[in-house]
Amino acid sequence: MDPILQELVDEWFKLDQDETTRNEVSQLIKAEDYATLKQIMHPRIGFGTSGLRAEIGAGFARMNCLTVIQASQGFAEYLLQTVPSAAKLGVVIGHDHRHKSNTFARLTAAVFLQKGFKTYFFDHLVHTPLVPFAVKTLGTAAGVMITASHNPAAYNGYKVYWGNGCAIIPPHDKGIAACIEKNLTPITWDKNLVENHKLADRDFAVGLLKNYWSQLHEFHSENNFSLEMKSLKFVYTPIHGVGLPFVTSALHLFGEQGDMISVPLQDSPNPDFPTVKFPNPEEEGALDLAYEQADANGISYVLATDPDADRFAFAEKINGAWRRFTGDEVGCILAYFIFQEYKNVGKPIDDFYVLSTTVSSAMVKSMAKVEGFHHVETLTGFKWLGNKALELEKQGKFIGLAYEEALGYMVGSIVRDKDGVNALITFLHLLKRLQLQNLSITEVFEQMSKKYGYYTTQNSYFLSRDTPKLRALVDALRHYDTKSGYPATLGSKKITNVRDLTTGYDSSSTDGKATLPVSKSSDNVTFELENGEVIMTIRTSGTEPKLKFYICARGHSLEDSIKNATEVKQAIKSEWFHPQQNGLEEP
């Protein structure tokens, strides 16, 4: 064993008191599996704007009791340094059903209690949006949700919210990371401290949930979403997650309890997600059991939430075949419905805002131009959408929708983060409207396309365990052409603009500088082809070893837009990234 690895192992045994993870390391040493040992020990799991996310297991690079305690100590210390009366304001802590989630949540609570924080602890499983809602409602200094959302079963995570109810943005991530490095020695391992500590509140959840449902009902009623209508049957699946009781409560709230048929094999929380390869409704196969249930009952609609119920997915059966709508399509449909209802109740159009990210469909931008409402674009991630929504809210603006293409939707601003339950109930109201008009979602989307333009999005990724290679491949595009640096063409199409949010370059601005926030910690480059006929963004993932690309193509017809998107997708592979040559896996 090399000296650096030996030092890390010694440090691990000095700090870790969990017999399971101590034994994992001991077994690797006994087997002389130094390659795996090095992989789990270094580099330390990074704390970013998404908090922590990694596979569960021993080592400083993994999610385990020690790294959760260390993260909590650093976060608590950072709050004490930066937020006046942070301990008195307190923190909210919630968790989902994943392996070790309850243990990690209890250890997080123990650390904050030891640091003197009032600690609001959800005793039961919650869907992720309840934590930022609680932070906002209770006025706490921060919140922590233990979840890995829709990642595979081997993963868990530690998601952090600031006192404004939004996910954290820079520079908080770096500040917290620095405090973690200075607070590595555990101050407690007592998982039961939250049971009887005087600063622990485990009874707040009942009142908080009543408040959540009350605000949800009020928002939908005020904006004319929730008129009573005839029954509409649909199939719902939580994909082995926590969503079912929350969706059921939402249906009861609006008098719809008899309309839903569930998927028995996927109803209950199961951290192993046994019926799906990936518990992500974006992935092929994730909704197959729901389709089977719908087919068996003669139902044309499937609605789903991801395991922590912050994302929402929809599929419709048309002409005997299932169509799973993309996140962009659902986002545009929701924006259209919410705006129409807002307009119908006579509210001022100039106050209506829809927010989306740089990698979302351009259709919503076209819709805003045609209809006269405001559209604002942010960087990728709800941390940016939530904070921008809050900024506009303070100006008295109405946030109709904020969305990102990865099935994340914030309807209104009850929660300043994506909420799959609120999105689902909103979409259900839309379906009931269309039922009265004898229209399908597919038909409505065709009407929208004729009015706002035919747009096709094709999003995918390359997977590699060699993260530096992914960054190097993107960096090579900055030196692709000897004259301008960036490529001048892709396939048969001319590249007319480039925006690089890693370097801060934007060819479309007068001074060549980007107006959106710049970050050197990850890659984010947008190429505009043929003056907006195709907009494509390439970015490295903050939570996964992926190089993601997002293509939005416009055309004179659906077929034309698909053709444009497909040409660009193929050219990315054949001209820029050469997957086989570079050892990149495709989904």
UniProtKB/Swiss-Prot annotation:
Cofactors needed by this protein, per the record, are: Mg(2+)
The places in or outside the cell where this protein is found are:
Cytoplasm; Nucleus
Pfam families, A to Z:
PGM_PMM_I, PGM_PMM_II, PGM_PMM_III
> Which residues in this protein are found as Phosphoserine?
149
Residues binding substrate are 49, 53, 149-150, 310-311, 380, 404-406, 418
Q: Which UniProt keywords apply?
A: Carbohydrate metabolism, Cytoplasm, Glucose metabolism, Isomerase, Magnesium, Metal-binding, Nucleus, Phosphoprotein
Single Gene Ontology BP term? Answer: purine ribonucleoside salvage
The entry marks the following residues as binding Mg(2+), namely 149, 306, 308, 310
Tell me the GO molecular function terms.
Answer: magnesium ion binding; phosphoglucomutase activity; phosphopentomutase activity
Cofactor note as given: Binds 1 Mg(2+) ion per subunit.
- The enzyme class is isomerase
Q: In the UniProt entry, which residues are flagged as the active site?
A: 149 (phosphoserine intermediate)
Q: Quickly give the catalysed reaction.
A: alpha-D-ribose 1-phosphate = D-ribose 5-phosphate
Query: Which PROSITE patterns has this protein been placed in?
Result: PGM_PMM
Q: What is its EC number?
A: 5.4.2.7
Highest rank taxon of the organism: Eukaryota
A GO-annotated cellular component: cytosol
Stored CDD domains: PGM2
Q: What task does this protein carry out? A: Converts ribose 1-phosphate to ribose 5-phosphate. Involved in ribose salvage via the pentose phosphate pathway.
Q: Which PANTHER family match?
A: PHOSPHOGLUCOMUTASE 2B-RELATED (PTHR45745:SF1), PHOSPHOMANNOMUTASE 45A (PTHR45745)
Record-stated family: Belongs to the phosphohexose mutase family.
Q: What is this protein called?
A: Probable phosphoribomutase
